[in-house]
Amino acid sequence: MARRCEICNKGVVAGVQYSHSHRQSKRTWAPNIKKVKAIVKGTPKTVHVCTRCLRSEKFKELYKKSLAKMQFNNCIFILHKNKG
């Protein structure tokens, strides 16, 4: 699965983890990415979206407007979440 959000472009970050004795080990932090079926420019598509963008008010407003008016011009709207 892609480790990058297609809306905010959030991706994997590398860094160093320190133990109690201050020994270092390299590690990565990955964002919480979900696969979502959405309508992009009028066509249904599977999109990788982080949970922060999925919960955002802007994203929810776009979804509500799309259901009310059924306008799909250059916007991403959720159809339903994939299970799994």
UniProtKB/Swiss-Prot annotation:
<keyword id="KW-0687">Ribonucleoprotein</keyword>
<dbReference type="GO" id="GO:1990904">
    <property type="term" value="C:ribonucleoprotein complex"/>
</dbReference>
<keyword id="KW-0689">Ribosomal protein</keyword>
<dbReference type="InterPro" id="IPR001383">
    <property type="entry name" value="Ribosomal_bL28_bact-type"/>
</dbReference>
<dbReference type="GO" id="GO:0006412">
    <property type="term" value="P:translation"/>
</dbReference>
<dbReference type="InterPro" id="IPR034704">
    <property type="entry name" value="Ribosomal_bL28/bL31-like_sf"/>
</dbReference>
<dbReference type="GO" id="GO:0005840">
    <property type="term" value="C:ribosome"/>
</dbReference>
<comment type="similarity">
    <text>Belongs to the bacterial ribosomal protein bL28 family.</text>
</comment>
<dbReference type="InterPro" id="IPR026569">
    <property type="entry name" value="Ribosomal_bL28"/>
</dbReference>
<protein>
    <recommendedName>
        <fullName>Large ribosomal subunit protein bL28</fullName>
    </recommendedName>
</protein>
<dbReference type="Pfam" id="PF00830">
    <property type="entry name" value="Ribosomal_L28"/>
</dbReference>
<dbReference type="InterPro" id="IPR050096">
    <property type="entry name" value="Bacterial_rp_bL28"/>
</dbReference>
<dbReference type="GO" id="GO:0003735">
    <property type="term" value="F:structural constituent of ribosome"/>
</dbReference>
<dbReference type="InterPro" id="IPR037147">
    <property type="entry name" value="Ribosomal_bL28_sf"/>
</dbReference>
